Amino acid sequence: MNEKIGKVTLNLDYYEGQDFYSDGVIEEHLLELVKHHEPEEYQDIILKEKNWAVMYHLSQQRENILEWYPITKEDSVLEIGAGCGAISGVLAKKAGRVVANDLSKMRSSINAWKNKEAENLEIVVGNFNTVSDNLTETFDYVTLIGVFEYAKTYIQEEEPYRVFLDKINRHLKPNGKILMAIENKLGLKYFAGCKEDHVGRMFEGIEGYKNTSGVETFSKRELEKLLDANGYHNYRFYYPYPDYKFATTIYSDSYLPKKGELRNNRRNFDAERLLLFDEGLAFDTMISAELFQHFSNSFFVEIQKKEENNA
């Protein structure tokens, strides 16, 4: 069953009739905001409300993680974990076709209203495992923006990350790519006094998620080993700064930051933090020691499709 919200198609064929996760009343508030305001008004709303969730879901700066990437109108994109549509809009502007998937009908409705002019956007509501099993279309890109770390929650397998990657791999065209954005559990901000983004506890990732189940981020070396061990040998790392959520600069191995560039570090909009040391000076030390890539707060990883006989 399909619904139309503006020019967007809301596909409910795989929706089970209830949302299994929610941020509560703030989602209802977000729905009202996007129903009654245009994107040009969002920045004024953010400044007026001073609310983390409103900023997180409506800020145009969220799009920076993919605004620069060379997706074209010849390309099709599968967006997994689309949420309230912070990234769906920029994908729809760049690509020829976007299929966005999310488990929540409420969040998908917010997405549809937020991007209601995007006639090339189809939002499929439902568990990705079910959607994946019924999806025959293949895509040039599959995006995992803040999604891969939750694989253990939704895939009940002994090797959930491998299963998730291989499930995604089947939906890529030849020469297709996975585009992943994820926090670095050894990001400098976590040493400097920021709480772990997903669980809100100090040093939780640094200490190996000893009090956490269901979500896990990785260091650069851990992510490289995970990809290599599962046959994904062709990948490239980028380094969003200050992080992937509100990136202002995207660095790469061929263009790394210079001393003095990384000074925009008080970005804890969602929670209080400690200031244990001067992050700018610490970044300078990492840069001089050629260790920035390992202490970047986030990663953006471009992963080439794995050939079926490549393990």
Predicted regions and their residues:
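N-terminal auxiliary segments of SAM/dcSAM-dependent transferases
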Residues: M1-H37
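Class I SAM-dependent methyltransferase SAM/SAH-binding core
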Residues: K94-E122, G126-T130
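A short acidic, Gly/Pro-enriched loop at the edge of an enzyme's catalytic core
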Residues: D133-V142
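A short glycine-rich, Lys/Arg-flanked "PGG" loop and its adjoining helix->strand segment in the class I
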Residues: E159-K177
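Conserved class I S-adenosyl-L-methionine
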Residues: L179-R201
